[in-house]
Curated annotation (Swiss-Prot):
Record HAMAP family: MatK
Protein name as it appears in the record: Maturase K
Keywords assigned by UniProt, alphabetized: Chloroplast, mRNA processing, Plastid, RNA-binding, tRNA processing
The organism of origin for this protein: Kalmia buxifolia (Sand myrtle)
Subcellular location as annotated: Plastid, Chloroplast
Function comment: Usually encoded in the trnK tRNA gene intron. Probably assists in splicing its own and other chloroplast group II introns.
Stated family: Belongs to the intron maturase 2 family. MatK subfamily.
Length: 507
């Protein structure tokens, strides 16, 4: 038990007042401003204007601190949503930049801790682990031998103070945390940061990086304790997850010390399952096990109580589904994943007799779902709800080469991401929709017919919808039938895909 306490106490920051002076450095906000302008690769541009004054940001922060320590400090109220100026300046842009500056500054101690941890250790190529596709080879290796999976929707914190309290265990800088708390509570349009959807919350486009940092940090906190208990109860340590845990260390909350000391043995019996695997991406997680339905129900109730008791997050049990892998498909990261039995007939030859032996093996399949994809194309006006291609009038003013390049780029991105699909029939249908939509857009622009345009462009239009691997196959394999058959059976996972943003880049 003493060893558990020591392990949970790792990672406390030893530096005080480290972040607070950086908040007043102009280069921090210049860095945040430049990163906001150039982050369209990962997130959509927040609409920053080039007209930006670092001096105004500094004055705003100084004014906020002055107001914070005054007794009557409410410069603007949360209920007063029409108040948009401080000291005569528009606060929308500068409040965003202050949040971005906070994000840059707060990330510094975590990055330094990571570098100090990696000193003297063999560094892995983490850029490969950043790829979304790196998850699927892991699922292929592990999930084929498992029976049940928990499909979990991770809840958001219901109060800002939960995020601040979690952050203060890592950053021992009371001044900066007080300023952050004051700014969050006094910012008049905080409610616009969280957009409520059907069954979950999502962050709005404004200040995404800062609130993604807070939310991801909160998720890593509960995952650290969760995986710690899992590893302490099993001889099969989670080696594949160890790399990600290097970035975060475990800690012990003061109020939980009695709980861990008193109930540790009672909790660990739930975790004694060696074939247990956990995968998370964004707000969804999968917990798969080789155990029975009863064991998965215990996991479900434990996770709900874990969130409520330790992190004060209310989560309804219906947000966690128990599915059997053999007869249920998982909708995860845009793929429909399932485990199916593959039957093989083997002929065994004896001296005089021969007989057939049937072998059954499990195989992990990944398929591209066609219905959601057609829905996305329909929303973007490339086709109707039935999947019939339409012209794109909004692009008619572009040049012919730009129109063809845009359609071709969308298909190449989709083909690149869904290269892991076992069957390419749905991807070929998407290719047909985009090609015909491109031809109809060009015909609409030149007031001609689709037939004439297809005849005029010929292979020129077709080549724009070739992916890199398709071009290699068509050059190396002369027969079209063998090429299409080879492409149909190929399943490729790439290590350079870090986001899913196929269509929105052009909308």
């Amino acid at each position: 038990m003493e060893q558990f306490k020591i392990d949970l106490n790792l990672g406390r920051s030893q530096q005080h007042d480290f972040i607070y002076p950086l908040i007043f450095q102009e280069y921090i906000y210049a860095l945040a401003h430049d990163r906001g302008l150039n982050r369209s690769i990962f997130l959509e541009n927040a609409g920053y204007d080039n007209k930006f004054s670092l001096l105004i940001v500094k004055r705003l922060i100084t004014h906020l601190i002055t107001q914070m320590y005054q007794q009557n400090h409410f410069l603007f109220s949360v209920n007063d949503s029409n108040q948009k100026k401080i000291l005569g300046y528009n606060t929308n842009l500068y409040s965003q930049m202050i949040f971005e500056g906070f994000a840059v500054v707060v990330e510094i101690p975590f990055y330094l801790r990571l570098l100090s941890f990696l000193e003297g250790k063999e560094r892995m190529k983490s850029h490969n682990l950043r790829s979304i596709h790196s998850i699927f080879p892991f699922l292929e290796d592990k999930f084929a031998f498992l029976n049940y999976v928990l499909d979990i929707q991770i809840p958001h914190p219901i109060h800002l103070e939960i995020l601040i309290q979690t952050l203060r265990y890592w950053v021992k800088d009371a001044s900066s945390l007080h300023l952050l708390r004051f700014f969050l509570h006094e910012y008049p349009i905080w409610n616009s940061f969280l957009i409520r959807k059907k069954s979950s919350f999502s962050f709005s486009k404004r200040n995404q990086r800062f609130f993604f940092f807070l939310y991801n940090f909160h998720v890593c906190e509960y995952e650290s304790i969760f995986v710690f208990l899992r590893n302490q109860s099993s001889h099969l340590r989670s080696i594949s997850y160890e790399t990600f845990l290097e970035r975060i260390s475990f800690y012990r909350k003061i109020e939980l010390e009695e709980v861990f000391t008193k109930d540790f043995k009672a909790i660990l019996w739930v975790f004694k399952e060696p074939f247990l695997h956990y995968v998370r991406y964004r707000g969804n997680a999968l917990l798969a096990s080789k155990g029975t339905s009863l064991l998965m129900n215990k996991w479900k109730h434990y996770i709900v109580n874990f969130w409520q008791c330790y992190f004060y997050i209310w989560s309804q049990p219906r947000r966690i589904d128990i599915n059997q892998l053999s007869n249920h498909s998982l909708d995860f990261l845009g793929y429909l994943s399932s485990v199916r039995l593959k039957h093989l007939m083997v002929r065994s030859q004896m001296i005089e007799n021969s007989f057939l032996i049937e072998n059954a093996s499990k195989k992990f399949d990944t398929l591209m779902p066609i219905t959601p994809m057609i829905g996305s194309l329909s929303k973007a006006k490339f086709c109707n709800v039935l999947g019939h291609p339409m012209s794109k009038p909004a692009w008619s003013a572009l040049s012919d080469s730009d129109i063809i390049e845009r359609f071709g780029c969308i298909y190449r991105n989709l083909s690149h991401y869904y290269s892991g699909s076992l069957k390419k029939r749905n991807l070929y249908r998407i290719k047909y929709i985009l090609r015909l939509s491109c031809a109809r857009t060009l015909a609409r622009k030149h007031k001609s017919t689709v037939r004439l345009f297809l005849k005029r462009l010929g292979m020129g239009l077709l080549e724009e919808f070739f992916t890199g691997e398709e071009q290699v196959f068509y050059l190396t394999l002369p027969k079209a039938s063998s090429t299409s058959g080879e492409l149909y059976r190929r399943r490729v996972w790439y290590l350079d895909i870090i986001c899913i943003n196929h269509i929105s880049n052009y909308e």
